[in-house]
């Protein structure tokens, strides 16, 4: 049987806020990608935000595949990047005579944000099949007045089919660095987060304790949050867990927050993260988020009217 070469897909995008003689034209994008990536039509959301879905045309990743995404946001640009479907990673261990130990599929995402820019990185669920090996890196560089939100959910094994990750493994590395505007001041690492889930960590009570779904949300805020405002925000985020199943925790960053989900339900993880997403918009007096058109959801994860500008936490306009 003919051996197929692995994919080495790249996607490079640049976002720019445009002003025309007729007024604010919002954020536009330039760039391109190589197979298996394909860009769908971008839409202009509220507040001039460019909403761009990325399609992975191969239908999933196998061992040896490598994907690279680079996002560059100019001053005052706003964008929401999502994926068209859940990303599947197929089993690798024991499937090849050349590599019986399996091969890793890898994805690297690099984000560079300029002053007053705003990036929402919201891919759909990642599904790892039994014996899959997947490693992802997310690197973000941004100044103190830029906003970055990411929410990622991974399912370790096809639970509905009675499948676990078995000998598979998932590794994740997130690095978030605040650039200094002063030449003599060094950049500051706001978050360096590394996870390695596989083996005993999947079943141990100090690990996932046999819970098949794990999720992380990170928000780097574009303004300082004082003690009272941050405390109130965390209380509201914790109240958003009501009616959802799983273990959900959140804590503060130097300028933002991080939330974790572990449990049985990617739906409940998505619901909680969507509510937090709405909170971060309301806190900055931005329009309530709308679920991207490519998300195949049968239920609405946001409240009927989403969140109005919070009365407990004063809204701050960033730009």
Swiss-Prot record:
UniProt entry keywords in alphabetical sequence: Chaperone, Cytoplasm, Nickel insertion
Pfam families in alphabetical order: UreD (PF01774)
Described function: Required for maturation of urease via the functional incorporation of the urease nickel metallocenter.
Matches recorded under HAMAP family: UreD (MF_01384)
The protein's assembly and partners: UreD, UreF and UreG form a complex that acts as a GTP-hydrolysis-dependent molecular chaperone, activating the urease apoprotein by helping to assemble the nickel containing metallocenter of UreC. The UreE protein probably delivers the nickel.
Family as reported in the entry's similarity comment: Belongs to the UreD family.
Protein name: Urease accessory protein UreD
Originating organism: Synechococcus sp. (strain WH7805)
Gene name of this polypeptide: ureD
